[in-house]
Amino acid sequence: MKILQFFLVFITFTMSTYGQQTDADIVGRLKTNSYKYSIKAPKAIDGNSDFNSMDITSHGGDLAKLLGDNIYKVDSLVIRGTVDDVDFHTLWDASFNGKLSVINMENAEVKNGIIPEDAFWHSEQVNIKEGYITLIHLRRIILPNGIKRIEDSAFSYVVNLEDINIPSELQYIGPSAFEQCENLKADSLVFPEGFEKLDRAVFASCTRLTGKVVLPSTIKEIGEAAFWRAKISSINFPEGLEKIGDAAFSGCRLEEAYLPNSCQDLGIFAFHLNLKLKEMHLPDGIERIPNNLADACISLCHVNIPSSVKSIGKEAFQNCGLLNDVDLPLGLERIEKDAFQSCNTFSQLVFPATLNFLGEECCTYLTGLKRIYCMASEPPVCEVSKLNIGYTPFGGYDSPSTPNDIPVYVPVGAAEKYRKAWGWDYFTNFIETDDFPTAIYDVTTEHSDSKSGIYDLNGRKVTDTQKGHIYIMNGKKVFLAR
């Protein structure tokens, strides 16, 4: 038996509790060691007399009998007729103990339309004492269109697998179904209408999976770590999608992420470490931006903060060094630890009147910052850093990482409060004003169409509106189309 070995790594994916529990370190939980391979599975070579192909018609449960003495000799197998769970075990056996590398089931009928759990992954492959997994030879499989479900771990650790098709009637893929299929390649993965859920870690660590993913209008959920470390560059998020799990796209190569308003359940680390991500649109209605949502997205330039957001989670946009100034909405109350740390292209921060808390070092290393506006009449509470003792949300008193001599504009009559408030006393230049930029006033009018309630993007009252311009009405941005 030819053996392909690598050091055994255990990855534990546990579902997080949203809301109260936000401390789980998804990156730590998903971090894996590098694999060490000894030999590759054999490849099919045209004209190779040693390459053994067979064409078999199965009647369900009799595949082993039909293969007979060839079970460990066959390289390529075309299957017609009915295939059941017993036959899938035979196929695994032929690929594990033999050299079966190519399976064509295009004209077969799989019983109940289900690829069973652990179809090509068995505990016999694991040598815990020696710390390795013996891999099967399977390199390519063609599935029939009648497949409706691919169950848990069906192709887990089939590292040699390079090619697989998505059946046209597929509705569900179970947890870890293709986890660690790190040679799997596809220019695109197109999921059919009727497909509703990509479960946990479905394509986790499929590091050669590039190109685009096309989701149908029926998709409801993308599970935790579904594409963790896959290198997909594009995916659509249809209206109707309700949930994106923790670390679902962590370590991918997405260039944009436009999330529909139906997606109200976002997991922590969901888009962490997407090095090419430039644009992100978050859905209206969410009240919290999750921890590490776009952490280390070093190319991110634009993101919106929906008007419904009340808190921005820990490290949400940490190390987004190209991120343009963000509009913080009225209603925002908390900015948590390290949320905007090292967003060094920010030129200004405009804190709304509702802000009452700034977490540890949330605004440190904003080296390009030129001004701060804070509409709150009472200085928001500043949390002291636990890592760098004595550090404020903006930096250390003796080693300022964010400029401390920039103008800080506060409401008339509030400057002295800010000068005496711990954390805010980091700054030396407070200026009282009642002329704040837009997005921090709560604009109220008796009639929403009243000209007295319309402002431009600099916060100035407008008497004559113009087609094609953006204005602030009742605290919201409005594009005037006509």
Residues covered by each model-derived region:
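A recurrent domain-boundary module in secreted/ectodomain proteins
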Residues: K43, K420-A439
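C-terminal tail/sorting-segment detector
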Residues: I470-R482
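Structural signature of tandem-repeat unit edges
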Residues: A24-G28, N52-S58, D75-V83, K99-G113, ...
